[in-house]
Amino acid sequence: MELPRQKRIYSSLETRFTDFDSLTQELKERELTGLVRLTFDACEGIIIFDKGRITDGYEIYGDEMPVKDRRGRNTRERSRIEPGKIDVYELPREILQIFIMTLRERPTQTLHTMYTDFRKLLNFYVDRKLYGTLEVKTSQGKGYVLLDAGKPVDVFFCNKCGSEALNELLNVVDQEDVEMDIYSREGGVR
């Protein structure tokens, strides 16, 4: 799964050489707001931190919906017995909250670029100051546009983020038919 990657703190730490409890303690002392991604052969685990506290966790198996992993308990246990990689990202709180909402929800609508213009859809969200996430499924993977009051607060696609990811996503959407899942909600993330 593609994740927001504002500021990478650690990359590709191996679980067999990393004491996850010590890493968690360090992130607590740093008062991390962001996420820890653990990648294993069978699944990915995402552990959410808010001001140094573990607040949530999810396990993702392939392209399936994320499965709730209360405070990352299963993921932390798996890190002790299975080889895997650990990545740690610091994120602005608003981006983290929008991303968490997307993990928790099912899409409210699915559209296809065969019938819908992606740029017009983005402009519609901006004009109406809507909140939500656009998940774009391409041949190169999934891309995400996180919107707060219509403003794209983050875009991530193909290991890129921000305007670079948006430009790459727009190029791909121009060249192929893609499916878009829309996660929209009333109000904001405050």
Region spans (language model):
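Acidic, Ser/Thr/Pro-enriched low-complexity segments and adjacent helix/loop capping patches
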Residues: 1-190
